Amino acid sequence: MSDHAKYSPRRFHPQAEAALADPVLRQNFRGAMDYLRAKRRDAFADPAEEAAVRDAAEQIRQRCLSRLPDLLEQLEANCERNGIRVHWAQTPAEANAIILGIAQQHGVSSIVKGKSMVSEEVGFNHEMARHGIRCLESDMGEFIVQLDGDTPSHIIMPAIHKNKQEVSDTFASNLEGFTPTTDVDALIQTGRRALREEFRRAGMGLSGVNFAVAETGSLCLVENEGNGRMCTTVPKVHVAITGIEKVVECLSDVPPLYSALTRSATGQAITTYFNVISGPRRAGELDGPDEVHLVLLDNGRSQAYRDEELRKTLQCIRCGACMNHCPVYTRIGGHAYGTIYPGPIGKIISPHLLGLESTSDLVTASSLCGACGEVCPVRIPIPDLLQRLRREAKHDAQPGHEPLAGQGAARSRLETLAMQGFAFAATHPRLYHAATGVAGRLRGLMPKHLGPWTQCREAPKPAPQSLHALLRQKKKES
């Protein structure tokens, strides 16, 4: 289940309250987040080296995005030259239709999947199931949440919200012959045995893409479990799906980005596996698919690209570091957001995918502490972009800016009238002094609760005397 039907960004507040009231979930996230932050801290022990790595990664992503249309054309040409068939999808529906057509052409009844956030974005599993095609997640975390009828809560560790006992309970309920245990090695072996035969039976393997190299027409896949390599080599057909922003100019761009990604995500110098796919199996090769397809998805990315400020959201390399350091995400987890991409990065990506009408609550679910921007390996100014999206949610597009989907959806007529009234009073001194004087005299009648903000804070009251009155009094006394 990957369509997030259980959760919705429109229900962010009740979902967040439910998460905060769940002590097991809070404890699971506390331990996991502490671990990931410590691993990243150790990986970047030298501040000068950290700055150099982040500077290099930022420069590469900005350079590649500045040439995005040209690089996409170059990628398509070189992929086709290598025997990789390239497909373009504007929407999730188009992406699913393309892959469904490939599957039906080859009589595929089961698909084994590697880690792919874009497949979650398009609701791939749900759509294939509607047409009688079984999809099985092979990433261990994704496999666990799929067995449980759950959804991922983190972009690199999908089952991070579950502890060992919960994983054991999931296996006991879904896998025959499993003996309940909380031994991590035993749990991993159980998952491995369940998945092994699926690779051989599957008619298609689906994967994501970490870096698509325009210069060579190659697809790079970063992983730790080996399931990605199995998905891309054992089935006769391999389909890779990715967003259009994942393209890089040349192979030499990959190592700096790879280093920034692994250190920021899991604190590793390198991952266990790094796969470079440059076409289907050739004559004389012993393994590999007969066909390789690449699906390039837009789904709102072009609109972000056309805005020079919002284009920075496309720099993301999906490391998850911003989530691990966010005081909101680390307390409520990923499900509360109700979006495929949770946490700080999800707040600035989701409006392009879903529109501001359904995501306006997310952009305000931030203290703007800046922790996300401080750890982002490609230096995305997430706090600045959140403030921009807050404005977009409540106001019309500024001159020269293309309106976003759902522009102004969070506009409040009462709030607008209140601000207009304040602006009028503030520009008319006599009216302003009279209003503040009345407010000071009536301060005892102020209600204790003024909306959600005062549910956990004391409502501020007007001062007994205004600043002007205090200054006049002091002047008289002197």
Tell where the protein language model's regions lie, with residue ranges.
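Intrinsic disorder at enzyme termini
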Residues: A5-F29, M33, R388, L414-S478
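The feature marks the mature, well-folded catalytic cores of soluble enzymes
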Residues: M1-E309
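Generic, well-ordered alpha-helical scaffold segments in large soluble proteins
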Residues: Q74, N78, N82, I98-I102, ...
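Short coil/turn segments at secondary-structure boundaries
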Residues: G141, A269-Y273, P403, R413, ...
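Conserved, hydrophobic alpha-helical core segments of structured domains
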Residues: L314-A321
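Acidic/polar loop patches that form or flank catalytic/metal-binding clefts of enzymes
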Residues: E249-L251, A265-I270, N324, P383-Q387, ...
